[in-house]
Amino acid sequence: MTDVIHELAATLEQKREEITAWMAKKRAEVPIPIYGSVDIRDSGWKVAVVDANHFPAGFNNISETDEPYLAELMKEHIDRLSPDCKWVHLYPESHTRNKGYVENVATIKRLLETGGFRCTIGSPELDGIGSLNGISGPLVLDPVQVVDESLNVNGESPDLVLLNNDLTEGMVSGLGAHKVFPPPHMGWQRRRKSEHYECLQKYVEEILSLIHI
């Protein structure tokens, strides 16, 4: 069965330029989130994207050699959509005991700082905790309160809020007055996997037609 995948890989390589052009065209048609991840299942005879996450938690798995490149891409995205941004506030999940997740947040912070941004971390839910224990050590949190529906971090207002919270429990307060990446409406409080597959299907059909499968 694995030969099917090998044959498909060869076809994709042959169609590389056409696929690249198709993807560039599709990216130009929709707003692209600052980050994201997909869950892929490979059964040996079929490969499928089974989920998409707009608030990924796997940055701690990135190799150190890739970090400068990713920091540059993140900076380019922020500069393009928020050219005056100097300060990014990272709004995390409240997973205070998940060291892997904490390390993910620490890595995002490092990428932002490598890109030249000031980066603070915290949320009203985590206010007063002080720090979280990550794999490489403690991650310092900044005091965050909601004042007039705006996030107040150490008495100031950040230029941009970077969400790393999938909003499973619903919308959080304090975001309305800020520019927020990714948009809060992409959280799980509104998204459905059935809708994800409906949107994905048309792209699947287009690419299959392009590569004649």
Model regions and ranges:
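ATP-dependent carboxylate activation and anion-phosphoryl transfer catalytic cores
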Residues: 1-131
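Structured alpha-helical segments in the cores of large, soluble enzyme domains
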Residues: 71-79, 166, 204-209
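Conserved acidic residues
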Residues: 86, 154-161, 178
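Conserved, structured core domains in eukaryotic proteins
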Residues: 127-129, 160-164, 189, 203-206
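Charged, often glycine-rich, active-site loop that binds/positions anionic groups
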Residues: 130-146
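Short amphipathic alpha-helix with an adjacent loop that forms part of the alpha/beta core around
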Residues: 143-156
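A short, gly/pro- and small-residue-rich
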Residues: 161, 167-196
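Conserved small/polar residues in nucleotide/adenosyl-binding loops
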Residues: 211-213
